[in-house]
């Protein structure tokens, strides 16, 4: 829970739990993960942990316009290439390969720090119909405006990290958290709660496959 010094925050029934993704059976297709948070909020640490824990056997590409940044220096995986820009044709190729091989390959596309992908058709397909062809995705962004509403509504796992922009926090609450917060709270109180809840590299994990929400922190 958020800091105990504000008893009002205790009205929000979101428990602290160890981080764990209850991944769907690979036979049913791929999965999708969305991480939303500001720089240095813990997204890169979480991304590396998820890759190490859940995607060791996947083949794919890490797309980032900041691919030379320190955050990616330790993300070296034999089956995951690094690309300094977003290349939608590669995602389409993954789909085509699995279409011709009966979903033989566990493909993964990681899209991090690519602010211009919002209207891309391959990203839309990746988070919707391509999952049925064994394609998984991880999208990392600094605000929800970088992802269109259809993509957002089809994400399996949503991870909400600290945001330093009140407008971004308000939009995040409206999209993902409105049903979890007391109706009597105004947005100043909701924003205050969000900042406190996601401080010190904590984040909220929404599991849309199992209908759960919890607060987590990855300690490495």
PLM regions and their residue ranges:
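Conserved P-loop NTPase motor cores
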Residues: 21, 30-53, 65-69, 78-183
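Conserved catalytic segments around the Walker B and adjacent sensor/switch elements
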Residues: 56-64
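Phosphate-binding and hydrolysis-coupling loops of NTP-dependent motor/remodeling domains
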Residues: 172-174, 178-220
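N-terminal pre-Walker A segment at the start of P-loop NTPase domains
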Residues: 1-22
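Short, surface-exposed beta-edge/turn micro-motifs
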Residues: 58-59, 106, 157, 200-203
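Conserved hydrophobic segment flanking the Walker A/P-loop of ABC-type ATPase nucleotide-binding domains
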Residues: 26-27
């Amino acid at each position: 829970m958020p800091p105990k010094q504000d008893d009002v925050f205790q009205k929000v029934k979101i428990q602290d739990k160890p981080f764990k993704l209850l991944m769907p059976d690979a036979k049913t297709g791929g999965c999708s993960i969305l991480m939303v948070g500001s720089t240095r909020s813990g997204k890169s640490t979480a991304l590396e942990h998820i890759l190490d824990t859940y995607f060791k056997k996947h083949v794919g590409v890490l797309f980032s316009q900041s691919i030379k940044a320190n955050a990616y220096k330790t993300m070296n995986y034999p089956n995951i290439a690094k690309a300094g820009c977003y290349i939608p044709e590669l995602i389409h190729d993954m789909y085509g390969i699995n279409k011709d091989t009966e979903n033989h390959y566990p493909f993964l596309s990681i899209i991090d720090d690519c602010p211009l992908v919002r209207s891309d058709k391959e990203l839309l397909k990746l988070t919707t119909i391509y999952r049925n062809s064994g394609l998984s995705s991880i999208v990392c962004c600094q605000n929800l405006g970088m992802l269109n509403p259809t993509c957002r509504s089809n994400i399996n796992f949503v991870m909400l990290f600290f945001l330093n922009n009140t407008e971004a926090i308000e939009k995040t609450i409206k999209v993902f958290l409105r049903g979890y917060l007391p109706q009597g709270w105004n947005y100043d109180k909701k924003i205050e709660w969000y900042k406190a809840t996601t401080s010190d590299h904590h984040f909220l994990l929404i599991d849309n496959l199992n209908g759960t929400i919890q607060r987590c922190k990855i300690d490495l």
